[in-house]
């Protein structure tokens, strides 16, 4: 089945490409989603008329992806995880965990766009890539820190009780 792509489709082609796909993929996914249209003489004329509009829309999406990439690149996102000896994590840092950490910083990205070569299973800094558009990939750093070490840095209970008593005495005077 030959179709004309109405938008960029990952692992298939770009806007305006005429590609051959299996019938089921075309009928059940590309055509209902509006990502493609059948190649017929009538559809070719219709596509030529709407090509400029589609091209402008794709350029807008690309420019928004570029702006978001500028915001993301150089960003350091901290993720707290439980870790055992030798800085090994109990479990691993997943794309959904990274997505939630980005959302906390005001950047909303679908977890499926976050690219991990392998699961993150150790503490430290790791470089993570995000595919924002077919042509735009941004990189940022995920700092995986241990929850236990953060709790160990808190002052002892006796120290906090002493400082609380001192503050109460100052206010009583």
Swiss-Prot record:
Entry superkingdom: Bacteria
GO CC, alphabetical: ribonucleoprotein complex; ribosome
Pfam families to which the protein is assigned, alphabetical: Ribosomal_L9_C (PF03948), Ribosomal_L9_N (PF01281)
Protein's UniProt keywords contain Cell membrane: no
GO molecular function: rRNA binding; structural constituent of ribosome
Annotated region described as Disordered, given as residue ranges: 151-173
PROSITE patterns given in the database record: RIBOSOMAL_L9
rRNA-binding found in the keyword field: yes
Record GO biological process: translation
InterPro entries per record: Ribosomal_bL9, Ribosomal_bL9/RNase_H1_N, Ribosomal_bL9_bac/chp, Ribosomal_bL9_C, Ribosomal_bL9_C_sf, Ribosomal_bL9_N, Ribosomal_bL9_N_sf
Keyword set, alphabetical order: Ribonucleoprotein, Ribosomal protein, RNA-binding, rRNA-binding
Family label: Belongs to the bacterial ribosomal protein bL9 family.
Function as written in the Swiss-Prot or TrEMBL entry: Binds to the 23S rRNA.
Protein name: Large ribosomal subunit protein bL9
Annotated organism of origin: Lawsonia intracellularis (strain PHE/MN1-00)
Gene: rplI
């Amino acid at each position: 089945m030959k179709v004309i792509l109405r938008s960029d489709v990952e692992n298939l082609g770009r806007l305006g490409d005429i590609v051959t796909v299996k019938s089921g993929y075309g009928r059940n996914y590309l055509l209902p989603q509006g990502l493609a249209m059948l190649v017929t003489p009538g559809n070719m004329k219709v596509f030529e008329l709407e090509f400029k509009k589609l091209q402008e829309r794709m350029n807008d999406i690309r420019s928004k992806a570029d702006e978001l990439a500028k915001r993301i690149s150089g960003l350091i996102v901290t993720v707290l995880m439980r870790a055992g000896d030798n800085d090994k994590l109990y479990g691993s840092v997943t794309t959904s965990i990274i997505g939630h950490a980005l959302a906390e910083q005001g950047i909303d990205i679908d977890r499926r766009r976050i690219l991990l070569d392998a699961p993150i299973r150790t503490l430290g800094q790791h470089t993570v890539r995000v595919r924002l558009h077919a042509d735009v990939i941004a990189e940022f750093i995920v700092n995986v820190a241990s929850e236990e070490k953060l709790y160990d840095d808190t002052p002892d209970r006796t120290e906090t009780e002493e400082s609380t008593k001192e503050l109460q005495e100052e206010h009583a005077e």
